[in-house]
């Protein structure tokens, strides 16, 4: 049986990256929440 997690850097960035987050209102809300919480890493692009 094939496993569900097949790592791919490009897909990861396109789906969860900073620019992807900035594209939508809800994505910007996510970034705002993470900034408010003081997260060191806002998105997967910050690795």
UniProtKB/Swiss-Prot annotation:
Keyword Ribosomal protein: yes
GO molecular function: structural constituent of ribosome
One annotated Gene Ontology cellular component of this protein: ribosome
Keywords associated with the record: Ribonucleoprotein, Ribosomal protein
InterPro entries for this protein: Ribosomal_bL34, Ribosomal_bL34_CS
GO biological process: translation
Gene3D superfamilies cross-referenced by the UniProt entry: 1.10.287.3980
Source organism, top-level taxon: Bacteria
Family assignment from sequence similarity: Belongs to the bacterial ribosomal protein bL34 family.
Protein name: Large ribosomal subunit protein bL34
Originating species: Deinococcus deserti (strain DSM 17065 / CIP 109153 / LMG 22923 / VCD115)
Top-level taxonomy: Bacteria, Thermotogati, Deinococcota, Deinococci, Deinococcales
């Amino acid at each position: 049986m094939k496993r569900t997690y097949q790592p791919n850097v490009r897909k990861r960035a396109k789906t969860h990256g900073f620019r992807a987050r900035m594209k939508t209102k809800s994505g910007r809300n996510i970034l705002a929440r993470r900034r408010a919480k003081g997260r060191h890493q806002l998105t997967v692009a910050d690795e």
